[in-house]
């Protein structure tokens, strides 16, 4: 990895570090008022206080972990389901069941993410599980589409056709002809879904959904403190900047990593043992 690519990993890693280990860093209580509302930064409160007089630094340190956990769980579940359905649909795309599955997935993709979030949150008020479920339902259609097309392209290659003509089992063709080229695409797709899940979780916090107050949440912090922008903008700017840095940083990281990973996958598509079988 070049110095430029290494440097591009710093912002998302720093934000992830703040989100993951922030709650364990010694700081003031993130939920208890410690001073007056919207007090400016000082030696006692490095980022000042928010609308209720709570320490902004403490809430920033405590407010990212829920977003990361929700996004990670949603991405893992959605990616695994998308990988399974996409692989199956790509390898059996001519079958009626595969076509019906893809049509059903397309119908799910037509539902707005915010509508799904609102409906699920209404059924489970104050629950982070509703945010995770909405993220999963939103991510599955896109993952299935992308991975299905990738699998279909791999199945149509000459070496995959030769393996099928030779009588190789579906499991063998999946292992040797599909998975080596599918894994990089699946990882890149999972990264994109992670960013989308973070954004949806932040949106849920902004709308007051999911775990309720006084729990800290970067998205909720932006909404709660918007009225005090002219008095102390830090309670809004800091969490907003962290969300942007995380989304842009992960996107740039995926962009830098995609070239080398996909290149290696393309060169390593057919291993030495497979070349002998094809010949």
Question: Where is each model-derived feature located?
Answer:
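Transmembrane-helix boundary motif in ABC transporter permease subunits
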Residues: 22-25, 70-106, 118
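Transmembrane alpha-helices
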Residues: 13, 65-81, 171-204
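Generic hydrophobic transmembrane alpha-helix motif, especially the helices
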Residues: 46, 50, 94-149, 153, ...
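C-terminal transmembrane helix and the adjacent membrane-cytosol boundary/short C-terminal tail
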Residues: 138, 184, 191-192, 233-279
């Amino acid at each position: 990895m070049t110095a430029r690519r290494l440097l591009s990993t710093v912002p998302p890693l720093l934000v992830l570090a703040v989100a993951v280990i922030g709650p364990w860093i010694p700081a003031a209580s993130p939920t208890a008022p410690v001073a007056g509302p919207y007090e400016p930064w000082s030696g006692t409160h490095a980022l000042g206080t928010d609308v209720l007089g709570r320490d902004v630094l403490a809430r920033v340190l405590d407010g990212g972990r829920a977003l990361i956990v929700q996004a990670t769980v949603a991405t893992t579940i959605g990616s695994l389901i998308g990988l399974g359905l996409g692989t199956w649909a790509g390898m059996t795309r001519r079958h009626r069941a595969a076509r019906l599955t893809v049509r059903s997935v397309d119908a799910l993709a037509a539902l707005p993410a915010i509508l799904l979030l609102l409906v699920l949150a209404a059924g489970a008020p104050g629950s982070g599980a509703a945010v995770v479920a909405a993220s999963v339902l939103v991510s599955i259609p896109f993952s299935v589409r992308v991975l299905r097309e990738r699998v279909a392209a791999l199945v149509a290659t000459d070496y995959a056709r030769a393996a099928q003509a030779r009588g190789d089992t579906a499991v063998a063709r999946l292992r040797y002809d599909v998975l080596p080229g599918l894994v990089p695409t699946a990882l890149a797709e999972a990264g994109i879904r992670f960013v989308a899940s973070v954004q949806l979780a932040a949106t849920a916090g902004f709308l007051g959904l999911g775990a309720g107050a006084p729990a800290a949440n970067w998205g909720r912090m932006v909404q709660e403190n918007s009225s005090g922008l002219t008095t102390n903008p830090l309670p809004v700017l800091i969490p907003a900047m962290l969300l942007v840095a995380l989304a842009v940083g992960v996107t740039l990281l995926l962009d830098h990593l995609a070239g080398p990973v996909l290149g290696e996958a393309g060169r390593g598509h057919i291993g030495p043992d497979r070349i002998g079988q094809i010949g």
